[in-house]
């Protein structure tokens, strides 16, 4: 068999049966979903409004806060329980009176509804969260909880079965 035909066939088979099967993932081993979200450098928004993961899937989520002369804002990213966006955002605005809220707590409000969060990132910083997606399907909001940002700087992590 011609070597080119062999590699083309191997590529086609790999595409049909799915990622990880021919290239090292053990059967039953979950595939890691890698997502990068960047804070928009001139507006209060993320470049990603929605992403989808499987329930119980391993996730590597990277938040990038780019550095340039336009972006001087710190940002973070919280993943929270469905239906709690306004509650968490309002709590973040209210907790600004606490001097430790920005410095020690990275603008993360005290709440059991916060599932995962990054630290507060200055321009030019990034952070990667590694976690297992919730086991229950649903729309899990993510937001920047720096005071005043949450109402426009949010999106949805869709968890599917």
Protein language model features and the residues they cover:
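Short, solvent-exposed loop/turn elements at domain surfaces
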Residues: 43-47, 70-73, 86-88
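Short Gly/aromatic-enriched secondary-structure transition segments
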Residues: 73-81
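Extracellular/periplasmic metallocenter environments
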Residues: 64, 69, 105, 112-161
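N-terminal edge beta-strand
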Residues: 30-58
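Extracytoplasmic/periplasmic copper-protein system
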Residues: 23-40, 80-105, 132, 147-161
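Bacterial N-terminal signal peptides that target proteins for export
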Residues: 1-9
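Short beta-strand elements of extracellular/lumenal beta-sandwich folds
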Residues: 57-65
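Bacterial N-terminal signal peptides
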Residues: 8-18
């Amino acid at each position: 068999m011609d070597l080119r035909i062999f590699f083309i066939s191997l590529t086609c088979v790999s595409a049909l049966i799915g990622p990880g099967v021919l290239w090292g993932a053990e059967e039953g081993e979950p595939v890691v979903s890698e997502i990068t979200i960047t804070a928009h450098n001139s507006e209060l928004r993320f470049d990603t409004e929605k992403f989808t993961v499987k329930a119980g899937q391993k996730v590597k989520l990277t938040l990038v806060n780019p550095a340039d002369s336009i972006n001087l804002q710190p940002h973070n990213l919280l993943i929270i329980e469905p239906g709690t966006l306004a509650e968490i955002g309002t709590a973040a605005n209210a907790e600004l009176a606490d001097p430790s809220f920005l410095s020690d707590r990275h603008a993360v409000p005290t709440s059991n509804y916060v599932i995962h969060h990054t630290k507060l990132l200055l321009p030019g910083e990034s952070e990667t969260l590694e976690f297992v997606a919730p086991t229950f399907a649903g729309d899990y909001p993510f937001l920047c909880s720096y005071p005043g940002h949450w109402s426009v700087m949010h999106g949805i992590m869709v968890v599917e079965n």
